Structures are given as structure tokens and as C-alpha cells.
Amino acid sequence: MSAFKARGVENPSYEDPDEKQKPDLEMSKTNGIGVDNPSYYKNPEKYLGNENEEGKSNNDNEEEEEGEEDQGAVERCVNKFYGGIHNFYKRNKKIIHYTFLGLLLVGYFALVIAACIVNFKQSLALLVLTLIAIFFFFWDLFIAKYGDKIAEALKPCQKFLDNHWSIIRWFVYGALLLAVILWLTLDTAKRGANQVIPFFGLILYILLVFIFSKHPTKVRWRIVIWGLLLQFIFGLIILRTKPGLDAFNWLGIQVQTFLKYTDAGSRFLFGDDFQDHFFAFAVLPIVIFFSTVMSMMYYLGLMQWLILKVGWLMQITMGTSPMESMVSAGNIFVGQTESPLLIRPYLADLTISEMHSVMSSGFATIAGSVLGAYISLGIPAAHLLTASVMSAPAALAISKTFWPETKKSKNSTQTSIKLEKGQENNLVEAASQGASAAVPLVANIAANLIAFLAVLAFINATLSWLGSMFNYPQFSFEIICSYVLMPFAFMMGVNYDDSFLVAELLGMKTFFNEFVAYQRLSEYIHNRESGGPLFVDGVRQYMSVRSEAIATYALCGFANFGSLGIMIGGLSSLAPHRKSDIASCGIRALIAGTIACFSTACIAGVLYIPELYCPNLLMSTLFENGTTVNTTNLMSCCTDLFKSTTMLTPKNITFTEGFNTTMLNGCCTFFPSGFNCSEVRPE
């Protein structure tokens, strides 16, 4: 009891030690300390501090709250303003878009019209591109609105043809055969027999493909006839009509001009003397530039639009499946490994005949990215562009003859195909991605050229060593190819004397790659244009312009053994469970792609008529054969030679356009009155 009293109210000075340890509850309410806030006991320093500091922080908090209130008011006003703009845009989105687009179009058309008024010649390219874009824009609108109605209206005609095609087809085939015979008769009477040989060469190649076909009885001749007909129509428009020839020549010049902009990057990176190492520093950078442009076009959807249009044309005429048509059209613009990506979701469902067709199309054409490189070597751009277009239907025709379809395609309508746009976020990323994607391609080209040229040199050295044992040290890989492949070159319409050189190029392209062959062809072109001697140590140095053109078409494809491995590897990675089917198609697809290129060359041989190139005519006609074929051409060329000759003294004579003293002496023999020939000293 006393102890209790000692600790009770009777002893107010006494402090209970337990009570002493407890904090003031009023303080706990104010400062968040005490039993109501158990974390205080764990970290009391967080809640205890100087009273002055507490007062100061309270003042700061009040000021911050006032600032936050002011800032919140401003933010609310800004948010309200932008919210109003956003809502207005959402309500009038279409009107704003169309208004903005209309203003852009009005400004663009005003620019085009003003440019044409000020300088029509310089504005021609812009005008042509604008008119083409307008035409296809309204064409798409027309088809979108009336396409189904037109198809519905034509259904009775289609039904009638399907029911009576077994009879009608003989009239169609007879009319086509009669037209071909009349064409060849009239053309041969006018041009000579050079155009007849490639026609029979084309028939020979088709017969060979048919004889060795996988299923000869299953060949659909509609595909073959329409494929060849599309080839012929494309070639006729481009090679025989002046508007078509001028258009593709103009297009070739524009492409060459466009590719010249690559020099800016090459000069910056490699210096002003970059062309001293022409192939490495001038040709290969073009591949990077072209790949960049193609990637940008793909991002914008232009490539997909072009591919769909060309693929649609081949599908409705030839009757091939949408998959085959799209890949064949895509190969005009992209490479053999990129074009299958267009139908990547459908690769697993392709029939084996469709797979063979996809591979054949890749072998029969070249990629747009390397097209510029070939042009930079001096290969005529118009011929390369024409060959790229003509080989697309040829690949389908030959491949479907070599391996006909025996099953029904799972994707038989064009509406089942959807070509995706690029996955890049913007145009700059697309350009960067395209440039980066070209780096492995450039490295692959450079590595293959180094390897193949080295291997070719070794093979030639070995063959020369073997040949020297029989007193024939000239024996080489080129000579073997020139004799083995000479009949194929001759049947394309190449002159007999040039067929051995073209056969060499075919061998290089098939066993090495087309870059090696085109590089050698560019040397022949340069030798001819420089007006050098036709023979050096008994070796022919160049060929005729017509033979160069036919060779350009025959070489325009990836059909070589190196590409075979690339094709099988690329397709196998896209469709792993179809690897055995892909491998089984490989060799046949390679042969089909090669013959497709040959058929394109045959069509070119039938249609192509070279412009009169006087230095070549004078060298080959006057001094190789000793007789003239066309006196009118000879006289015209000699007249041009006399006009281009400047004679200061008998020993000081200058020429232009590839002429030389040998040609002058020859022309003086035939037309002595046309020039002061008495002053010319014979060589």
C-alpha cells in the first residue's frame, strides 16, 4: 500500500518509468509521433528535429502550395486550350486532311505548270512522272468503282469461251501462227535472214524444255503462249516502235543520271580519286544507294503497288496462281532472296510446281539493286530495263512447261494476297535500313568477284599448262565454253563470228556469276567504242552492236551455281519443313531460269535492229570480209568519216567518233572523190 501511495497521487513528484518512456499523445497527434505511428520507434530521427526547421518547412510548404495552385490554374488553361483543338481536329479530321492535301496538290500542279512554261525541256521528266501518276490514280478509282460490274458483265463471254474453248483455241492458235509467219516473211524480206534464226532458236528451246518436262502431258499451253506473247508485245513496243524505244532510252538516261548522285557519297568517303579504283569505289556504292531508294519506296507502298499491278496482268493473261505471279513481278524490282518474302505467309502452302516457279523466276531476273551497278559498267540501261521486264513472263512460261502443275493451288484468288508495308517507323529509318541491308550484298559481290576471278585465273593457268604439252598454250576455260556453248549463242541470233565470244560470256555467267560476264562484256563494248583493232594476236577484241545487245539479254539473270546455293538456303530458312521439296527443285529451276534468259535473248534477236554504228561497220564489213553488204550504209558511213576527219599534214590526221586511219584508207579505196584521198598515206 505504501509503495502504491508513494507512486500515486499522494506523491506527485514521482514519475513512473513506464510513463516516462511514452511520448506525449498530443504531440503524436500533431507531429504524427507516438503509438498512433509505430514507425516512429523504428526511425525516430525522421520525426524529430529542430523547431526552427519545422517552422521554416511549414512556411516553405505554404509557399509551394500557393505556387502549385497557380501552376495548376495555368496547366488547366493550357489543357483546356489544347483539348479544344484536339476535339476540333477529331470532329473535322477528314475535312482538314482533304484541305491540306488539296492545297499541296494545287501548289504542286502550279509548280509543274510554271516549270513547263519557263523551261519545258528541263521539266519533261517531272511532267511525265506527274501524268503517269494521274493516269494510274484515276485508273485505280475506275477499277475500284466499276471493276466488279465489268467482271459481272463479262461473265457470259467467259462462260461461252470456257464451254467452247476446245474448238475456239484452234482458231486462235491458227491466227497466231499465221501472224507469226506473215511477220517473219515481211521482216525477213526487209531486214534479211538475221531475224529468222532466233525465231527457230526460240522454238528449239521450248521443244527442249517440253521434251525434258516433269509431266509433258500436263503442260498448260495457255501459260506458254501468253508468256511468249507478253514477251513479244513488250519487246515489240520497246524495240520496234519509236515511242517505246525513245521512252526506254529516255528512262535509261534518267536512271543513269539518278545513279550518278552516288558519286557524291563516294567522293566524300574515298576522295576525289575514287574512280581510280572504279569497281570498288564507284560501282559497289551504287548498290548501297539503290538499295536505300528501294527500301524507301517499299516503306511508302510504291513497290507493293507496282508489284501488284504487274502480277495482276500476268495472272489474268497467263492464268498462273497469284503466288507465282506476285513473285515473278517482284523479281523485276527486287532480288531472288527478297521476292519470296512478298508471299512469306503462303510459302508453306505452295505446290511443288509453284515452288519451282518461284525459284525459276529468281534465276531468270536480276535485282534492281545491282541493275545500277551493271549500268555503271557501261552496259546499255535501256537493254537491261527491257530484259528485266521481258524475263518475268518468260520465267513463268518456261518453268510451267518444265514442271507443270498437277495439283490445285490453295490460294487461287488475288484477293487472298496482302502485301505488307515496311515495318520501319518513318522514312529516315527505312532509308537507313536499306543502306544497312546492302552491306552484306556488297560484301558478297566483292568477295565472289575476288574468289571467282582468282579461280578463273588458276583454271586458265592450269589449262594453259596442259595445252602447252600439245603446243597449244592458248587453251583456257573461255575457249572450252566458246565451243561447247557456241550453238546456244548462235541460235539466239548472234552473228557467227561473234557467237564464240558470246558463248564465253554465257560460260562465265553460268559457272561463276553474271558480274564477271558483264565486266567482260563491258570491256568488249569499250574496245568497240574506242575504235581499236578488231584482232590482237589473233584474238577478237569486240563484237557487233547487235551481238552486244543479244548478249545483254542472255546474261540478265541470276542463273548460276553460286545463286543456286543462295536460293536453296534462303527459301529453306523461310519454309524449313519444305526443305526437301526446295532442294529437289533446285537444278531444274536453274535450267529453267537459264533457258528463260535465252528465250528473252531470242525475242530480242528477232526484234532488235541496231542503229548504224559506222566504226564497227567499217571495220567488220570492209576489212574483215573484204566485201560490202549494204552499199548505202557504207557510203553513209564513209561520208561521216570524211566529215569527222581533220588532216593538217599527211602524218597529222585526227578523227572523232571512233574512226581511224585504216578506215579512212578503206573508204578512199571505194570513194576516192569524197575526200582528199591523194594526200592520205596508206598504212
From Swiss-Prot:
Q: Which organism is it from?
A: Eptatretus stoutii
Chain ranges sitting on the Cytoplasmic side read: 1-97, 145-168, 215-222, 301-324, 344-356, 404-438, 573-585
| Gene Ontology terms, MF aspect | purine-specific nucleoside:sodium symporter activity; pyrimidine- and adenosine-specific:sodium symporter activity
Q: What is this protein called?
A: Solute carrier family 28 member 3
Q: Which residues lie within the membrane without crossing it?
A: 325-343, 503-522
Q: Which InterPro entries match?
A: C_nuclsd_transpt, C_nuclsd_transpt_met_bac, CNT_C_dom, CNT_N_dom, Gate_dom
* Residue ranges of the region described as Disordered: 1-71
Q: Where in the cell is it found?
A: Cell membrane
